Amino acid sequence: MAKWGSPFVFALACLALSWRVYGDDFDLYDALGDPTEKPKPKPPKPPKSPTHDSGDLDLSDFFDTPVKTTTKSPRLPPKQPDLRFSTTTKKPRTTKIPPKKSDPNDFDLSDALDGNNGKGDISDSDLDDILNDGYNPDKKKGGGGGGGGGGRATGQGDNDGSDTGFGSQAETGTIAGIASALAMALIGAVSSYISYQQKKFCFSIQEGLNAEYVKGEHMEAVVSEEPQVKYSVVESQSAIP
């Protein structure tokens, strides 16, 4: 049995070698191990417990990776231009006028003030002194000095007289207006009284005609009824034996 065992093993080895040679091409890589080993498959992850109500539908349950919440603010839509008409109007730009440099020789109203006048200029006090001295340029109404004062008093009297005349004219106009108003009221009262009397007269004539008409109707009724009365009296007399 030992004699036949070793040749039998040798024959099987030769058969396997020939099958290897004829069945596939010879390659030195066959002597080496498999260079590209396939990665081991990852074990399946356990199902994630839901954080919300199990009865609600959530699309994140179909994905293994957790959903990342973004904290980025949403993009605002572009601002639309306001097409409505605005009532505000911009102030027009104007060029500023440069200040004019004052010339000491120009006319200025402030020169008439007493504080700005020099010693040799005319002021209000000079005019007061002239009036207090009794100066009057109108020579026809008086002479110099006291005569001028009398002329001034006369002028004031004339002014008072003109004012009195104006007041009398105003009073005359007022009296005329009152008189015209009274006259119009009197004329209106007379005309209304006349129209009232005319209407009253017309109604009295109408009432008289109506009374005569009614009276005539009664007379005709009496005349038509008298023969019947007489006939009834004759019948009653004939019936008496």
Swiss-Prot record:
Extracellular face residues: 24-173
InterPro entries the UniProt entry points to: CD99L2
Keyword Hydrolase listed: no
Keywords for the protein's UniProt record, in alphabetical order: Cell adhesion, Cell junction, Cell membrane, Membrane, Signal, Transmembrane, Transmembrane helix
One annotated Gene Ontology cellular component of this protein: anchoring junction
Principal location class: membrane
GO BP terms in the entry: cell adhesion
Signal sequence coordinates: 1-23
Intracellular or extracellular location(s): Cell membrane; Cell junction
UniProt-annotated stretches for the region Disordered: 30-168
Pfam family, any one: CD99L2
UniProt xrefs under PANTHER family: CD99 ANTIGEN-LIKE PROTEIN 2 (PTHR15076:SF12), CD99/MIC2 PROTEIN RELATED (PTHR15076)
Family recorded in the similarity comment: Belongs to the CD99 family.
Name under which the protein is recorded: CD99 antigen-like protein 2
Organism: Xenopus tropicalis
Protein encoded by which gene: cd99l2
